Amino acid sequence: MAASFDEINQQWLIRFLEHRIGDRRIIRLIQKWLKAGVMEDGLVTVSDRGTGQGSVISPLLANIYLHYALDLWAVRWRQREATGDLIFVRYADDFIVGFQHESDARRFLNEMRERLWKFALSLHPEKTRLIEFGRFAAERRERRGLGQPETFNFLGFTFICGKTRAGKFQIKRKTRADRMRAKLKMIKAEMWRRMHQPIPKQGQWLHYVVRGYFNYHAVPTNGRVLHVFRHHVIDLWRRTLRRRSQKDRMTWARMTQLANDWLPKPTILHPWPSDRFAVTHPRWEPYAGKPHVRLCVQ
């Protein structure tokens, strides 16, 4: 969505909160948070819109607002309007919606724009797309001469229509290339600042950074990207160590040993989505009888 934190209607937000909170003291406290304003260059600006992005409570209030403005409406639309299967996934103000039928996708998109407009929200024009995606997308697009299925980005990953080694359809998740470049750029700048620290201290910091990166990105089908990321980190570390001394004694053999001592190796840490879902929904059969899915992406 486009600038949802800044456009939230505060009157609607209070009404949503009053639906579940009966204690007027809590409501008044939240109203004070909303009216606290934002300080920029010494000037306090108070607005009757938005939740003040950056505030501790802003993400919570925005999530409550979107729950009533979008989530409940989407569930009701699926129950009453959809002619096929519909999948809705939202994280903060980013969401994707999957449809069995293209006609449902187009109707949902048009009606969702009207729904959001009622609550002072709108879709981001550059990030909102309607694409053909799923197990039959490649075959159908090839028949129409349209090339490979489009990809989409969600929560730091690029989702791709792929195949297993056995030739079966598989949704592949890869770390977004631009996000990885940005992370490596941050590491490079920080290593420059830490150039003259002892090697163990540098290694400890890099260990935490790489471990944290793997904790999020170590999903199935993303293993190669993890190896590439680790290789780039090793190279950045080697370049840093070479710059701090005129006598270049940092060979790749020694660098490899340092990396093995300090940097975690790439390992897939997260289960397949279908396996995770089956734990909480044991009677669910992944992809059972489901045709291809088209996605409306935000």
Q: Where are the predicted features?
A:
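Non-catalytic terminal/accessory segments
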Residues: 1-298
